[in-house]
């Protein structure tokens, strides 16, 4: 199942002029088409809906009508009271997972009209059906009926060529793929980007994810968003919340929604909620707070070129808890399934005009808004930043998170020769001593963020890749490729096909901290000790 959203320029004006309630793409009809409803004059409406005398209702009919009105009134009153008791929240789910603005204030949200031409290029071009229909009886008939002759004046010829091009554009689009190779200065060359985000049981982190998306300083009109929701638990609200957030994102009202949500959450938060925050480094907590506090960049609320939402399951049955996802025995199975999901999303969302593909996890907590152009500027075919995560102070405040970005070692190559063909080497586990150089471990907090190193394997938290490598056959192996799978195998495959794979050791983004079972036990133990000491 796929759902698609896109924004057009001058939405309000065109909607009022044309009587349209939804934007229309080249796959439908043009924004310039006249509303067929306006063609009916008042006389025809009067004829169609001529008054017809009705027979006098019986007492039984009157009784039934009055009873129906009473039932409707009671139900309406019940729904109204229920609405008020829900704190006036327009769209919500239990436990505060998704609160999308109060019904009272949502009417006053400011929306944005868009003028950038990139919102309307390629498959979003304006195609006017009235112009196209002129050619229904052939070009010769068009010339005679429109201009009275097949010999055109320069002015008439200009109009003819313009309308003929619109006819061709309605069915044929020509792409010179050499124009979409991916440039290191993509900001200046206006490179289009496909931004892919896989989601599973992710309702709780969607606000964080969308705030990061809005904070991207790469022009939003050049970014197409593609989400894949898969294998969620029964009762999970990820898909519904994602659709609701996306609509507000494309209306330019999502930041206003988040202000309201944050206020509600703050008023409902209890002292025991996210108890682990008491044990986090205060400096890091302040950095997170500053990252999501105004002022934001001037295009923070600007909608993206398009949003596509896909839902497809791949048979993933592994739990989403930290301990479940990171158990060594499930890593091979899990990564092959994730490889299938990534390949499916790429195949369905990648367009000929995309120059870059940016893969991003939803649960990144801190990341520069300029990350796309920062990675792009290094001109690698595949490039990743360093990924760390914060820790409670009793665990050292921070640690490397993504160990899947590495340089190959002789020890790992020798290890692979001892394994079965279908075995998957997993980094960071004692069962697989590879002795590789990991990008995470060569980080210097004060190092040059522009320094780049060549890599063999890459992690999947944040990957920028040139779109041409996918067109040329590189994929996220959903099978064992040189004893690896998914993103690590993706890096190895890209390198084997002659592409440059690299990473930035001193350019760090931060993953959210997810307490493990052992961490939660330690925090509970410390809390009990505090209570004993205070008694």
UniProtKB/Swiss-Prot annotation:
GO BP terms, alphabetized: cell wall mannoprotein biosynthetic process; protein N-linked glycosylation; sporulation resulting in formation of a cellular spore
Positions carrying Phosphoserine: 25
GO molecular function: alpha-1,6-mannosyltransferase activity
Record note on modification: Glycosylated.
Record has NAD as a keyword: no
Chain ranges on the Cytoplasmic side, renumbered to this chain: 1-64
Any one GO cellular component localisation term in the record: endoplasmic reticulum membrane
Residues in compartment: Lumenal: 82-535
Signal peptide region: none
Segments of this protein annotated with the region Disordered: 22-48
Main location as per UniProt: endoplasmic reticulum
Miscellaneous: Present with 4750 molecules/cell in log phase SD medium.
Record-given protein name: Mannan polymerase I complex VAN1 subunit
Species assigned in the record: Saccharomyces cerevisiae (strain ATCC 204508 / S288c) (Baker's yeast)
Gene label: VAN1
